[in-house]
Amino acid sequence: MNDITIERQEKAEGEAFEKICMWCHGWWGVRDGLTADQVRYNMSHSLGTGRQLPQTFIARRSGKAVGMYQLSMSDDLQSRPDLYPWLINVYVDEGERGKGVCQAMMETVAENAKSAGLEHLYLYTKHIGLYEKFGWEFIETVPTFRTESPVERVYMLKVESRKVKVER
Protein backbone atom coordinates (compact mmCIF):
# COMPACT_ATOMS: atom_id res chain seq x y z
CA MET A 1 0.00 0.00 0.00
CA ASN A 2 2.97 2.30 0.33
CA ASP A 3 2.70 3.02 -3.38
CA ILE A 4 -0.58 4.89 -2.69
CA THR A 5 -0.40 8.57 -1.80
CA ILE A 6 -3.22 10.85 -0.71
CA GLU A 7 -3.01 14.52 -1.61
CA ARG A 8 -5.26 17.51 -1.64
CA GLN A 9 -6.69 18.56 -5.02
CA GLU A 10 -6.57 22.36 -5.00
CA LYS A 11 -6.90 23.25 -8.68
CA ALA A 12 -9.73 22.69 -11.13
CA GLU A 13 -7.38 21.32 -13.76
CA GLY A 14 -5.28 18.32 -14.63
CA GLU A 15 -5.81 14.58 -14.93
CA ALA A 16 -7.03 14.10 -11.36
CA PHE A 17 -9.64 16.86 -11.65
CA GLU A 18 -10.92 15.38 -14.91
CA LYS A 19 -11.16 11.95 -13.27
CA ILE A 20 -13.12 13.17 -10.23
CA CYS A 21 -15.54 15.00 -12.51
CA MET A 22 -16.03 11.84 -14.58
CA TRP A 23 -16.45 9.64 -11.49
CA CYS A 24 -18.98 11.97 -9.85
CA HIS A 25 -20.95 12.51 -13.05
CA GLY A 26 -21.27 8.76 -13.59
CA TRP A 27 -22.03 8.10 -9.93
CA TRP A 28 -24.52 10.78 -8.91
CA GLY A 29 -24.62 13.37 -11.70
CA VAL A 30 -26.58 11.15 -14.07
CA ARG A 31 -28.87 10.01 -11.23
CA ASP A 32 -29.64 13.65 -10.37
CA GLY A 33 -30.13 14.70 -14.01
CA LEU A 34 -26.97 16.81 -14.22
CA THR A 35 -24.80 17.29 -17.28
CA ALA A 36 -21.06 16.68 -17.19
CA ASP A 37 -20.53 20.47 -17.31
CA GLN A 38 -22.79 20.97 -14.30
CA VAL A 39 -20.86 18.38 -12.31
CA ARG A 40 -17.59 20.00 -13.40
CA TYR A 41 -18.88 23.37 -12.15
CA ASN A 42 -19.86 21.81 -8.82
CA MET A 43 -16.51 20.08 -8.45
CA SER A 44 -14.57 23.26 -9.30
CA HIS A 45 -16.22 24.85 -6.25
CA SER A 46 -15.57 21.80 -4.06
CA LEU A 47 -11.82 22.15 -3.74
CA GLY A 48 -11.51 24.81 -1.01
CA THR A 49 -8.40 26.59 0.09
CA GLY A 50 -6.54 26.64 3.37
CA ARG A 51 -8.64 25.21 6.21
CA GLN A 52 -12.01 26.04 4.66
CA LEU A 53 -14.45 23.38 3.56
CA PRO A 54 -15.09 21.75 1.22
CA GLN A 55 -11.80 19.98 0.58
CA THR A 56 -11.11 17.28 -1.99
CA PHE A 57 -8.47 14.58 -1.62
CA ILE A 58 -7.10 12.33 -4.36
CA ALA A 59 -5.59 8.86 -3.95
CA ARG A 60 -2.80 8.19 -6.43
CA ARG A 61 -0.97 5.01 -7.34
CA SER A 62 2.20 5.62 -9.32
CA GLY A 63 1.00 9.17 -10.00
CA LYS A 64 -2.35 8.07 -11.44
CA ALA A 65 -5.63 9.14 -9.76
CA VAL A 66 -7.31 6.00 -8.40
CA GLY A 67 -9.70 7.32 -5.73
CA MET A 68 -11.12 10.35 -3.98
CA TYR A 69 -12.97 11.67 -0.96
CA GLN A 70 -14.24 15.05 0.17
CA LEU A 71 -14.82 16.84 3.46
CA SER A 72 -17.89 19.07 3.24
CA MET A 73 -20.26 21.04 5.47
CA SER A 74 -23.26 19.67 3.58
CA ASP A 75 -24.48 16.58 1.81
CA ASP A 76 -27.56 15.59 -0.15
CA LEU A 77 -29.14 13.66 2.74
CA GLN A 78 -32.24 15.82 2.98
CA SER A 79 -33.75 13.98 5.94
CA ARG A 80 -30.97 15.05 8.37
CA PRO A 81 -29.94 18.67 7.71
CA ASP A 82 -28.94 18.90 11.38
CA LEU A 83 -25.92 16.65 10.83
CA TYR A 84 -22.63 18.14 9.61
CA PRO A 85 -19.78 18.15 8.58
CA TRP A 86 -19.63 15.19 6.19
CA LEU A 87 -17.25 12.78 4.53
CA ILE A 88 -18.69 12.59 1.02
CA ASN A 89 -17.90 11.19 -2.42
CA VAL A 90 -15.70 8.34 -1.21
CA TYR A 91 -14.89 6.65 -4.49
CA VAL A 92 -12.34 4.10 -5.69
CA ASP A 93 -11.84 3.49 -9.40
CA GLU A 94 -13.41 0.14 -10.34
CA GLY A 95 -10.11 -1.39 -11.44
CA GLU A 96 -8.49 -0.47 -8.12
CA ARG A 97 -11.11 -1.86 -5.74
CA GLY A 98 -9.86 -4.43 -3.25
CA LYS A 99 -6.26 -3.21 -3.61
CA GLY A 100 -5.90 -1.06 -0.48
CA VAL A 101 -6.98 2.30 -1.91
CA CYS A 102 -9.96 2.74 0.42
CA GLN A 103 -7.83 1.80 3.43
CA ALA A 104 -5.13 4.29 2.43
CA MET A 105 -7.74 7.03 2.06
CA MET A 106 -9.46 6.20 5.36
CA GLU A 107 -6.11 6.35 7.17
CA THR A 108 -5.90 10.06 6.25
CA VAL A 109 -9.50 11.18 6.87
CA ALA A 110 -9.18 11.92 10.60
CA GLU A 111 -5.89 13.78 10.18
CA ASN A 112 -7.24 15.91 7.33
CA ALA A 113 -10.47 16.61 9.23
CA LYS A 114 -8.52 17.63 12.31
CA SER A 115 -6.35 19.94 10.18
CA ALA A 116 -9.58 21.56 8.98
CA GLY A 117 -10.59 22.17 12.61
CA LEU A 118 -13.27 19.47 12.73
CA GLU A 119 -14.10 17.39 15.80
CA HIS A 120 -16.25 14.78 14.07
CA LEU A 121 -17.58 13.73 10.67
CA TYR A 122 -20.71 12.00 9.42
CA LEU A 123 -21.19 9.82 6.37
CA TYR A 124 -24.05 7.84 4.93
CA THR A 125 -23.74 4.66 2.95
CA LYS A 126 -25.34 1.34 2.04
CA HIS A 127 -22.11 -0.49 2.87
CA ILE A 128 -22.41 -2.51 6.07
CA GLY A 129 -19.13 -3.41 7.75
CA LEU A 130 -16.81 -1.29 5.61
CA TYR A 131 -16.50 1.89 7.64
CA GLU A 132 -16.75 0.27 11.08
CA LYS A 133 -13.27 -1.20 10.63
CA PHE A 134 -11.95 2.34 10.18
CA GLY A 135 -13.39 3.58 13.47
CA TRP A 136 -16.78 4.85 12.27
CA GLU A 137 -19.72 4.31 14.62
CA PHE A 138 -23.17 3.41 13.26
CA ILE A 139 -25.71 6.05 14.38
CA GLU A 140 -28.99 5.21 12.67
CA THR A 141 -30.80 4.22 9.49
CA VAL A 142 -32.54 7.19 7.86
CA PRO A 143 -34.84 7.82 4.89
CA THR A 144 -33.20 9.45 1.87
CA PHE A 145 -36.37 10.58 0.04
CA ARG A 146 -34.95 8.96 -3.13
CA THR A 147 -36.65 6.06 -4.87
CA GLU A 148 -33.48 4.22 -5.96
CA SER A 149 -32.12 4.09 -2.41
CA PRO A 150 -34.92 4.81 0.09
CA VAL A 151 -32.82 4.31 3.25
CA GLU A 152 -29.15 4.70 4.14
CA ARG A 153 -27.00 4.05 7.19
CA VAL A 154 -25.49 7.08 8.96
CA TYR A 155 -22.11 6.82 10.68
CA MET A 156 -20.03 9.19 12.79
CA LEU A 157 -16.27 9.42 13.28
CA LYS A 158 -14.91 11.27 16.31
CA VAL A 159 -11.83 12.95 14.92
CA GLU A 160 -9.98 13.98 18.10
CA SER A 161 -6.39 12.88 17.68
CA ARG A 162 -7.47 9.60 16.10
CA LYS A 163 -5.13 7.99 13.66
CA VAL A 164 -6.78 5.05 11.96
CA LYS A 165 -4.55 2.11 11.11
CA VAL A 166 -6.09 -1.17 10.07
CA GLU A 167 -4.09 -4.35 10.32
CA ARG A 168 -4.75 -7.03 7.73
PLM features: residue spans?
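Conserved active-site alpha-helix within GNAT-family acetyltransferase domains
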Residues: 115-119, 125-150
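Conserved acetyl-CoA-binding loop-helix of GNAT-fold acetyltransferases
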Residues: 89-92, 98-111
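A conserved beta-turn-beta hairpin within the catalytic core of GNAT-like acetyltransferases
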Residues: 74-87, 97
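Conserved beta-strand in the GNAT
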Residues: 56-58, 64-74, 86, 91
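Conserved N-terminal entry element of GNAT/NAT acetyltransferase domains
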Residues: 1-18, 160-167
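Active-site rim helix/loop that mediates acceptor-substrate recognition in acyltransferases
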Residues: 24-60
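Short hydrophobic/aromatic beta-strand or adjacent loop that forms the aromatic wall/cage
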Residues: 54, 149-155
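Active-site beta-strand termini and strand-to-loop segments that position acidic
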Residues: 60-62, 157-158
